[in-house]
């Protein structure tokens, strides 16, 4: 491998990551506490900018009030390049700490393929059932990679 090409690729990747970080900041400023998450495409793009640059899987929560206004975006678990352990107890704890009425789950696939795995579908169902016990609505689970996949849009919720 040509060392100059390798250095160029590293530099280009670094610049791309900087751009993504700035884009995430801009989107984060658009979705501040109190903003209603009513546009699915904008919500997917927000999640993609927040989680898209990670090299490991990260599972996060968009914690919402009764009017689906953002209370907090919380990164809860970090895993490996192809998996992240998600613990329902910790999810319930995070939701109740801010008195959220609804939640959107989000996680990234560093591979770029946003197709949800069977494990993704199972944990989503388990979390949905668990949160129903404390009257918290699960509105969506967004998986981000090169594109975003919405469980709600696929009719899986």
UniProtKB/Swiss-Prot annotation:
Q: Where is this motif: JAMM motif?
A: 107-120
Q: Which InterPro entries does the entry mention?
A: MPN, RadC_JAB, UPF0758, UPF0758_CS
Name it: UPF0758 protein VC_0510
Keywords in alphabetical order = Hydrolase, Metal-binding, Metalloprotease, Protease, Zinc
Matching entries from SUPFAM superfamilies are given as: JAB1/MPN domain
Task: Kindly state a single biological-process term from the GO annotations of this entry.
Answer: proteolysis
Q: What is the lineage of its organism?
A: Bacteria, Pseudomonadati, Pseudomonadota, Gammaproteobacteria, Vibrionales
Question: NCBIfam families in the record, alphabetically?
Answer: radc (TIGR00608)
